[in-house]
Structures are given as structure tokens and as C-alpha cells.
């Protein structure tokens, strides 16, 4: 196995692992963008007025009523929630009782669209840790490979020509007018 192929393969492996680790991170925003594109009414200019959701009425939410399916509980998705956020999903996790409190009426707007989404700082920390781990693995593999190469060099004496271990002595020449000086490498002691 050649060293250039190993480094190339190692860098490709690290890049693919990093990409696979980042795909779940990127799938959340990508899914939100795709949902927003599907919910968009047309290709015309965006509506200049801000999109707001109407306040929820007090009482049990549609998701808490027994006998209703998930599709019915989510409500219509056309003009109401163009950004793909669903305030009902946030209320399901907050209020498991039979009655919605006063704080749960406006609380749906502060909940992220997908509770599985991580904040930006946590994503950045995850990416930083993955890159640090990849660099650590690279240096460990490189150190192990260098030790193996040094062991083989010591065992077989291949390419073991360190300048400290050499003693340079001039060769005897018949021609004295030649300016080229040749040296012989003698290893002193081993």
C-alpha cells in the first residue's frame, strides 16, 4: 500500500464521515425549506403583509381530543402556516392535562417547528467536535504508520542514511587534476 494512496483514502474517508454526520444536521432546515416551498401558493412575489397565526381558543387543543387522527388534529396547512410551523405540535409536548392554561394560548408561537432541531450553537459545537475527532484520528493513524515504517527501516536497513550516522571519506583517485571529489559513506558503528 503506497503512502500517497493511504493519505488520499484517509482524507476521502474523513470527508465522507463528516458529510454523513452533517446530513442529519442539514436535514432539519432543508425539510423546513421544502415544506415552505410546497405550501407557497404560487411563484409570484411574496405577500408584503406579515404572516401571523390566529390565537388558539381556550380549552382542549384538537390534538388532545380523543378519536381524532393526527392529520385532522394538525388542521389545514394552506394559507395558515406557510412556513411549515405547527403551534399544535408545541402544545402537545407542553400540556398533557385535559385543559389548556392561559400560558399555552400564545405559547405555540415560541416553540420551534421541529422539536428535534438543535440550536445553532449546539450544531456548531457538534461540527467542531467532529472535526477535532477527525484530526485526532488522522494524527494517530499517521503516528502508527510512521512507527511501522521506522521499525521496517531498522530491521532491514533500507533507506537508513541519516547524516549523523555517516562518515564521509574521500575515495582514492588516479586523476589529480579533476575537481570533482567523490565521497564514500561508511557507517561507523551499529
From Swiss-Prot:
Keyword Transmembrane helix: yes
Membrane-spanning parts: 124-144
Membrane topology (UniProt): Single-pass type I membrane protein
Keywords from the named record: Glycoprotein, Membrane, Signal, Transmembrane, Transmembrane helix
Primary location recorded for the protein, binned into one broad class: membrane
Location of the region described as Disordered in the Swiss-Prot/TrEMBL record: 42-117, 168-190
PANTHER family noted in UniProt: EXPRESSED PROTEIN, MEMBRANE PROTEIN FAM174A
Name by which UniProt lists this protein: Membrane protein FAM174A
Organism expressing this protein natively: Homo sapiens
Upper lineage: Eukaryota, Metazoa, Chordata, Craniata, Vertebrata
Amino acid at each position: 500500500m503506497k503512502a500517497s494512496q493511504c493519505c488520499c483514502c484517509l482524507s476521502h474517508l474523513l470527508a465522507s464521515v463528516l458529510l454523513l454526520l452533517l446530513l442529519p444536521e442539514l436535514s432539519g432546515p432543508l425539510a423546513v425549506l421544502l415544506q415552505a416551498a410546497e405550501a407557497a401558493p404560487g411563484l409570484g412575489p411574496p405577500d408584503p403583509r406579515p404572516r401571523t397565526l390566529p390565537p388558539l381558543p381556550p380549552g382542549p387543543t384538537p390534538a388532545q381530543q380523543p378519536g381524532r387522527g393526527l392529520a385532522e388534529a394538525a388542521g389545514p396547512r394552506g394559507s395558515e402556516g406557510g412556513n411549515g410551523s405547527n403551534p399544535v405540535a408545541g402544545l402537545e409536548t407542553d400540556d398533557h392535562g385535559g385543559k389548556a392554561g392561559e400560558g399555552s394560548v400564545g405559547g405555540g408561537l415560541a416553540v420551534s417547528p421541529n422539536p428535534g432541531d438543535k440550536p445553532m450553537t449546539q450544531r456548531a459545537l457538534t461540527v467542531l467536535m467532529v472535526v477535532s475527532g477527525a484530526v485526532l484520528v488522522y494524527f494517530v493513524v499517521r503516528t502508527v504508520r510512521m512507527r511501522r515504517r521506522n521499525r521496517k527501516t531498522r530491521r532491514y536497513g533500507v533507506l537508513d542514511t541519516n547524516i549523523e550516522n555517516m562518515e564521509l571519506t574521500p575515495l582514492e583517485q588516479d586523476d589529480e587534476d579533476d575537481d570533482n571529489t567523490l565521497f564514500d559513506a561508511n557507517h561507523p558503528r551499529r
